[in-house]
């Protein structure tokens, strides 16, 4: 393909990479290519062969053309250890000038993770395929906006020598047709316009209609949160996500929230329950401070829980209307006002303002709203801008009952967690309401007949509900 057909940004990157080819040849000149071992980790298989379920290729990168430097202290091995908990494959940028990549990063990740590793590069020459495999790649990226059919076929044949899978990137209908003719099995649809770096999230939907049913469709670029994943999940098998993860200080938290959403497991009473909640996929852990509640925790238990599982964001839940400062210890991320609804919207706003003044700017303030109350929807809409999150619950909370989800105002959904009787049996229906996440409590506890375990968090139920959450799409 002539350079006149290449997008300006892409053309400059590819030409720069072409200038690196001699350096790459010198770097692996000592390598007997014919003796390179074949890959034993299949990206295609790890992505479930396109048979359903949201899968992720999480990317290690320190910079990008659209954002510049995104992670100054870049440790791909540490990032890969995190990704290994959540992803089905790991992509590693190897282009140095615009992405800060290097083959050393590829080798580090390949040696760190059990997952198949994708060499993310602008591959135009067989020596790059050889280098990818030598440094541990199990798959390579080939871009049809860069390669003509003859070039692609030659590089694909070279990849086949080492059992490397190919992520074939396409950006329009013509490239999809070419990819099908060339035998592609993994289609990467890039939402980014390579001319101006803009994003079109509808591109994967349009092109999905043309991609064979037995292929894997990977949506690339612009996948920034779990809501986007759920919007695209009806036609995409997998998602390649990089900048949204490596730009965050806490990569583990960012990956967990991307895969599962901002969900909370409330009523934690033991360190082991907190550890299971986090391992299952929860972002938030609720600690209840009410002596009348069977899930009440003492300050001593609170400290043990936080020490045992520091990777949850803990929310102190209470029915009080004052004294929230007394609940603040190291590790408390938010306070949740679970007091009964006040007599008016003005009184609600005053209560929230008083609590916010009490706890200070470093602690979030959440408000639980009884949606069973005739005023619930009105109050939720009125105070949405005053709080960091709303908890939409039945009655005064803790009842294990479900309210009428149709009463949730559309305007508050993005800032709300849906609560009240949510269990593995109705989690999918709860997610379909479209709130930011779920607040899970009694629906994942052992029943009354479980002996001494009755009322404790059921680890199996937690795993089951988060499995449903991770595969849900609209």
From Swiss-Prot:
Residues 263-474 are annotated as: N-(5'-phosphoribosyl)anthranilate isomerase. In the N-terminal section; belongs to the TrpC family. In the C-terminal section; belongs to the TrpF family. Keywords: Amino-acid biosynthesis, Aromatic amino acid biosynthesis, Decarboxylase, Isomerase, Lyase, Multifunctional enzyme, Tryptophan biosynthesis. One of its GO terms (biological process) is L-tryptophan biosynthetic process. The keyword Lyase applies. Bifunctional enzyme that catalyzes two sequential steps of tryptophan biosynthetic pathway. The first reaction is catalyzed by the isomerase, coded by the TrpF domain; the second reaction is catalyzed by the synthase, coded by the TrpC domain. It comes from the Bacteria. This is Tryptophan biosynthesis protein TrpCF. Residues 1-262 are annotated as: Indole-3-glycerol phosphate synthase. The lineage of its organism: Bacteria, Bacillati, Actinomycetota, Actinomycetes, Mycobacteriales. Monomer. It catalyses: N-(5-phospho-beta-D-ribosyl)anthranilate = 1-(2-carboxyphenylamino)-1-deoxy-D-ribulose 5-phosphate; 1-(2-carboxyphenylamino)-1-deoxy-D-ribulose 5-phosphate + H(+) = (1S,2R)-1-C-(indol-3-yl)glycerol 3-phosphate + CO2 + H2O. GO terms for molecular function: indole-3-glycerol-phosphate synthase activity; phosphoribosylanthranilate isomerase activity. Its EC number is 4.1.1.48, 5.3.1.24. Pfam families: IGPS, PRAI. HAMAP family: PRAI. PANTHER family: INDOLE-3-GLYCEROL-PHOSPHATE SYNTHASE, TRYPTOPHAN BIOSYNTHESIS PROTEIN. The gene is trpC. Pathway: Amino-acid biosynthesis; L-tryptophan biosynthesis; L-tryptophan from chorismate: step 3/5; Amino-acid biosynthesis; L-tryptophan biosynthesis; L-tryptophan from chorismate: step 4/5.
